[in-house]
């Protein structure tokens, strides 16, 4: 693979936009990375990142493209909330303080998934992106993401890889 288009970079480009959208812009990053595999590649294949968002939220993101098990998990804690997600549309839970337990959060009425991919890869987001693009071209919708936002995310990815 090419360093400019490596698997880790691709994962950052998928994960960082929605994390920024949900938790706010990135204020600071602390990154640990290395080439952990014996693969003959010219880039690191394991990253552990501590992210501080402008909102004050702290989070960690691990990107590992060599593990035999593909994983995508998220836990978010705050004084007033707790969210757990195991990467697939049916595994998002939020803590209900009144019920003192977790309840499922429904993301989609129907999930589009290709069997060849891991369970956490669903096609719904790609479809929604295309609908928004066509609506924007036709003047019926505003773009959900801008080139300026892309440029900012790419700038953070460059800093992560530095």
How would you label these PLM feature ranges?
Residues 125-162:
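C-terminal helix-rich "cap/oligomerization" subdomain common to oxidoreductases
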Residues 15, 68, 153:
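Short phosphate-engaging motifs
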Residues 4-6, 117-121, 139-143:
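Active-site rim elements
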Residues 1-40:
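Predominantly a Rossmann-like dinucleotide-binding segment in NAD(P)-dependent oxidoreductases
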Residues 38-44, 54-128:
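NAD(P)-dinucleotide binding in Rossmann-like oxidoreductases
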Residues 25-31, 58-59, 83-84, 143-144:
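Acidic/polar loop patches that form or flank catalytic/metal-binding clefts of enzymes
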Residues 12-19, 85, 123-130, 150:
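A structural signal for well-ordered alpha-helical scaffolds and beta->alpha junctions
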């Amino acid at each position: 693979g090419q360093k400019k288009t490596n698997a880790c970079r691709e994962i950052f480009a998928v994960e960082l936009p929605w994390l920024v959208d949900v938790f706010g812009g990135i204020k600071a990053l602390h990154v640990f990375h290395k080439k952990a595999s014996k693969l003959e590649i010219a880039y690191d294949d394991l990253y552990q990142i501590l992210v501080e968002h402008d909102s004050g939220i702290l989070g960690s993101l691990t990107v590992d493209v060599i593990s035999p098990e593909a994983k995508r998990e998220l836990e978010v804690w705050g004084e007033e909330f707790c969210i757990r997600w195991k990467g697939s549309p049916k595994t998002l839970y939020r803590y209900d303080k009144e019920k003192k337990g977790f309840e499922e959060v429904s993301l989609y009425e129907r999930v589009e998934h290709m069997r060849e991919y891991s369970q956490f890869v669903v096609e719904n987001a790609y479809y929604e992106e295309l609908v928004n693009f066509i609506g924007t071209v036709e003047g019926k919708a505003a773009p959900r993401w801008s080139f300026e936002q892309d440029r900012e995310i790419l700038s953070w990815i460059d800093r992560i890889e530095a």
